[in-house]
Amino acid sequence: MAIMASRKHLKRFKSPVHWPIHPKEYKWTVKPSPGPHAIENSLPLMIIVRDILKVADNAREARKIINSGEVLVDGRPRKNYKFPVGFMDVVSIPRTGDVYRVLPDERGRLVLHPIDEENAGFKLCKIVNKTTIKGGRTQLNLHDGRNYLSDDEFRVGDVVKLSIPEQEILERIPFEKDSLGLVTGGRHTGEIGKIKKINITRSSMPNTAVIETGAGKTFLTLKDYVFVIGKDESVISLPGGK
């Protein structure tokens, strides 16, 4: 029984550092259920409703709100309070009219950035790999677990703009020199800048990219950490009007 409990629950002091909860307030916290995002890259819906948005005062109220279908993720009601919400997901509460996009800040924490009606109509997803399925068709595998059948013009590292709630591909944002990128990992998490150079090593060493921020700062980061958000300017609104 103890082994099963450890799998179903999560001690607060072992929760990811980006969760906005006090590690010593209580012993246990909600553990995200398996889903589109890994535990280290997500927030349980309960934490969002109770601790971040403060729509509920306690876990019981939060579960009631979530179970009633009042909270939407990417335009669809999610009634599982353990549902993992992650990077680029759009969270909305129609009753209050509030809509947010999940983004990383410069300390590596996931934050809910308020967005307007136009931004609420789409989300961005990165192509993490492609596979060829039966019949020779190409399947795009996205960072949030989605899969799409498409033509072969898309490349790994590109980002697609998806409509919400229809989930249709509206636009391709290519990963290429001079595209605008948001860094999602490493010491430069949350920083935004132009891709000035892409270094393909063709060895066991990881590929890298050189990023230049609007302030003229230049740094090197892993290519996999760069999430393109536009060509000349960002297609999404960003915290602080970046």
UniProtKB/Swiss-Prot annotation:
Disulfide bonds: none annotated. Keywords: Ribonucleoprotein, Ribosomal protein, RNA-binding, rRNA-binding. PROSITE patterns: RIBOSOMAL_S4E (PS00528), S4 (PS50889). The keyword rRNA-binding applies. GO terms for molecular function: rRNA binding; structural constituent of ribosome. InterPro entries: Rib_uL2_dom2 (IPR014722), Ribosomal_eS4 (IPR000876), Ribosomal_eS4_central_region (IPR013845), Ribosomal_eS4_central_sf (IPR038237), Ribosomal_eS4_KOW (IPR041982), Ribosomal_eS4_N (IPR013843), Ribosomal_eS4_N_CS (IPR018199), S4_RNA-bd (IPR002942). Residues 43-106 form the S4 RNA-binding domain. Pfam families: Ribosomal_S4e, RS4NT, S4. One of its GO terms (cellular component) is cytosolic small ribosomal subunit. It comes from the Archaea. GO terms for biological process: translation. Belongs to the eukaryotic ribosomal protein eS4 family. PANTHER family: 30S/40S RIBOSOMAL PROTEIN S4 (PTHR11581), SMALL RIBOSOMAL SUBUNIT PROTEIN ES4 (PTHR11581:SF0). This is Small ribosomal subunit protein eS4.
